[in-house]
C-alpha cells in the first residue's frame, strides 16, 4: 500500500502535480527527530529507482522542511546509484478557446494541466504505475476531475484544461490517453 501510494505521488510529481501528503500509511513524511534534526523515510523502493527520482527532483516537494528547517532523509532498499539521466521536460498547457465540450470517446475531464506523452520518461512512468505506457500517445492529464456538461453548478465548468481522456486513470491524479480536440459535433 505505501509503495503504491508513493508511486502515485512520484508519478504525479513526474508530470508536475503537487499533491499534499502528510502521512502515507505508517510513513509520516513530517516525522522529524527534534533532538537530532533528521528523519528517515524508507520508501521501500529499489535504490536505482529512488536515486533516479531524487536525481530528477521528483521527490523534492515531498521533503518539505519542518519548523526548524530540517528535511528528512529518504532511503530506499539499497544504496545503488542511478544511471538514468533523463529529466522531465513537459510544461503545463494553457487553456485554449477551443476546449472540448463533449467527447466522441472517453470522458470529459478538467485537468490542472497536460503534458505530451512523448515528452516523458516512459520507463520511469511504466515502473511507477505498474502498467505498460509504451503505446500511450497524446496528452497525459494531471489532477483531473470529470466535467458534467448537463446542468449547472459544481462540475459543469472548467477554468483550467478541458480534455477528453480514454486511457487509464489513476485516481484523477494522472489520466493517460487524453486529447484536447476529441469533440463531438
From Swiss-Prot:
Gene Ontology cellular component list: extracellular region; fungal-type cell wall
Keywords: Cell wall, Disulfide bond, Secreted, Signal
Record carries keyword Isomerase: no
InterPro entries on file: Hydrophobin, Hydrophobin_CS
Compositionally biased intervals (Low complexity): 75-93
Signal peptide boundaries: 1-17
Pfam families per record: Hydrophobin
Region (Disordered) location: 70-104
Localization (cell): Secreted; Secreted, Cell wall
Keyword Transmembrane annotated: no
Residues forming coiled coils: none
A GO MF term: structural constituent of cell wall
Amino acid composition bias (Polar residues), ranges on this chain: 94-104
Disulfide bond sites: 103-164, 110-158, 111-144, 165-178
Assembly mode: Self-assembles to form functional amyloid fibrils called rodlets. Self-assembly into fibrillar rodlets occurs spontaneously at hydrophobic:hydrophilic interfaces and the rodlets further associate laterally to form amphipathic monolayers.
Family the UniProt entry places it in: Belongs to the fungal hydrophobin family.
Its job: Aerial growth, conidiation, and dispersal of filamentous fungi in the environment rely upon a capability of their secreting small amphipathic proteins called hydrophobins (HPBs) with low sequence identity. Class I can self-assemble into an outermost layer of rodlet bundles on aerial cell surfaces, conferring cellular hydrophobicity that supports fungal growth, development and dispersal; whereas Class II form highly ordered films at water-air interfaces through intermolecular interactions but contribute nothing to the rodlet structure.
Entry protein name: Class I hydrophobin SC6
Organism: Schizophyllum commune
